[in-house]
């Protein structure tokens, strides 16, 4: 009793009690050998006495019967004995075969292969916490490598590569919209060099959700590497539309998986876990490998009242945390914002208030094309107020069409009208949902603001709601659009004025909840600029993750994970690839520099015709200016440049220089020096020499 009271406050008091009892028995019966508790029949302890369970009764009157009964009891547990956890032992080979068969099943539906959801029992059997801790040392002999091809130090272009042994898999393949410095560029996608170099090792790509920064680059990737694609139903539906536009749908392998399903990719087992975001069917990924389990959250938030009723699967994330998580890769977009992210339903309430405020006026609402929940709420409020709804923007029309066809959005009969039909209805009976919430040039709202839209002209009485927050870097473009709308007399409402937008990304408290329930050994912040990543790393420290277990990576870095350490092990190609029209990758930094120079300082073309035999100048040189100076107002400067060109060509002929490249370089250098001296500007100089 004294020893019991001494150890009763310890967390493992049962272990100490059993130890003391065994010591007591050893003293009492010196001739008995102490057998480990797990190898002998479980003993029932009662008031200091040891009694034998009923299944091994002894006959005290017969030594022979006692011996025989003990032998039977010893044989009996081989087929039906329970282990120390109270679970019936199974044949390991049989269990392995059953699990293998379960993982290999698939259902053919609508021409796609959908992996069948593994039973949670199988997951528990494979994830026993004691067994896992014992096996972890063996598993982690093989390191897990994670290469970041995009998504770090930027918002967009998300792409991650996992490598373990001879197997690789990808997560997401997004795009990034160009900034104002990228003249003439339509899209920016990741560099696929490392993927194409290791194409034979890539087992597949898993997509977390259907936003452009996660699926926008997929069509360009699949043109170079034909690998299977996995995603939830809506995500695959949106991908199908993109691949159809690129004309490669038939040659691609698209596979639908649901939250809870397991996808086997080489040595990787990928489980999809439902999360909340601003688009339905978003998932986090639990990626199991011989090295351990890594959770990549994707874009997420914790919404307790989501529009579709599907809350984040906290229970499964907690269970994985109990089983053991090697690393957590967490969304960092809102890591600098305290508190919790508002529920999407909050926007619906604001819409109803603002729509009523706009009584008698035409409503124009700009939002992300893929924000199906937002579109649904706009339609619901419009229906309640007796307004018709028109869609403007090709991407918006495509997404709504796909979502309606798949049952993710409800459109009442007769409420949706074509954009060509808006003039048939009174202004106070219309709501126009449009793209362009980020101020993108050539988007529908942009064209409306600058009077370039073929069907919609902004009127002084219009009520415009911009239901989005500018992505970092887009603030100037959004401000430009707002200014133009105001100049035309429209009233503009945006997020800073009213709650017309809530984020789809977790704020600080939600991020800390994710860390607390998953209990990762290592933490890598992803999806954000440097300031977001560092803030998220600070949150990880605040919940108790050791600083040495937190790593802030960068695009092009390869991170190696083992049970003992996390480190940056190397570099991989991970630059920007610019898409300009149908050209992919043919626009580089040099081309962008030239375009910027042309835009800022203009162009000077020098044209001269020279006799091929004698080297005499037959005509010219002519000096032509475009975008540099107005010729009529700068005749003296142009004339000075012409005389300088004459002198340079004459010197070259005198020196018998017949290498026209050398002549062009001299012309370029001399004229460039003159122009900078006279104007402090550096136009592009383009010499053209023709031989006759």
PLM regions and their residue ranges:
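Conserved hydrophobic residues forming the short capping helix/wall of the S-adenosyl-L-methionine
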Residues: 243, 540, 675
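A glycine- and charged-residue-rich anion-binding loop/surface
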Residues: 152, 176-180, 184-187, 201-202, ...
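His/Asp/Glu-rich metal-coordinating catalytic cores
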Residues: 127-206, 211-425, 443-457, 476-480
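Intrinsically disordered, low-complexity RNA-associated tracts
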Residues: 26-139
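Short, Lys/Arg-enriched N-terminal segments with co-localized hydrophobic residues
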Residues: 1-25
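Hard-cation-handling environments
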Residues: 337-467, 471-520, 524-656, 664, ...
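C-terminal tails and terminal domains of large nucleic-acid-associated
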Residues: 656-692
